[in-house]
Amino acid sequence: DPLCENWVLSADDDRLYLIDWEYAGMNDGIWDLADVSIEGVFTPENDELLLTEYLGSKPDQNEYKHFLANKIYVDYLWTLWAKTRVPYDGQPMEDWAVERYARLKDNLRLFAEA
């Protein structure tokens, strides 16, 4: 979850670390990259650069599909979460759920084509 509260600057090496105690325990690290991509509205070129930096080499087809799958999982989770919030938060949350679901469907198409 790339909220600003989840970034930590190391005093030792001036590197930024993304932490998220909600999901970090037993989750795939690619989940966090997928979430950064989604929340940052990354382009395919941004995604490739992010994955290349993380993996240390250009992602192969399986690595890219794994990343796309995680983008789908992220939007699925937040679509369901938003739908549960509609009775309490109203139309803005419904709109957010619809936006997430539309992107999920777009990424399903990209996954099938990859």
Describe each PLM feature range:
Residues 10-13, 52, 61, 103:
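An alpha-helical support segment within catalytic cores of ATP-dependent transferases
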Residues 8, 38-42, 106:
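Short helix-capping and hinge/turn segments at secondary-structure transitions, especially at repeat
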Residues 80-114:
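ATP/Mg2+ or Mg2+-diphosphate-binding catalytic cores
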Residues 30-59, 72-90:
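Active-site activation/catalytic loop segments of kinase-like enzymes and analogous catalytic loops
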Residues 40, 71, 99-103:
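Secondary-structure boundary/capping motif
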Residues 1-31:
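Active-site acidic catalytic loop and adjacent metal/ATP-binding pocket
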Residues 66-69:
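ATP-dependent phospho-/nucleotidyl transfer catalytic cores
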Residues 11, 25, 35, 82-85, ...:
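Short, isolated positions within intrinsically disordered regulatory regions of eukaryotic proteins
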